Amino acid sequence: MFVKQEFPDEIILIGGHLDSWDVGQGAHDDGSGVVHAMATLQMMKAINYQPKRTVRCVLFMNEENGQQGSKAYADASNANNEFHLAAIESDRGGFTPRGFGCEGDPETYPERFGK
């Protein structure tokens, strides 16, 4: 996790989930997402990147069974009054990227990402 001074209370979460479907071995869903999240922090450190906001890596469990891990994280985050500017997850395997999606209220995008 990187905690910085300019906006330390604004969290950008990157993550993946450790569990997989019972018939799968988990390399693509979502072992590759776990590696993507951890490698992002490693690269940020290697190039001495200094983010303006806190960057937190979270590896969830029990996502394939109703997203219980991320719901537990959200409950704890809400109880601690944390503000997450964005949450980024890679969950489509380690193949060539097919695109980038964003979910949320589009009216808040300029407010959240305009800084």
Indicate residue ranges for each PLM-predicted region.
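Metal-dependent peptidase/peptidase-like ectodomains
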Residues: 9, 22, 60-115
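Structured segments of extracytoplasmic/periplasmic soluble domains
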Residues: 3, 40-47, 76, 80
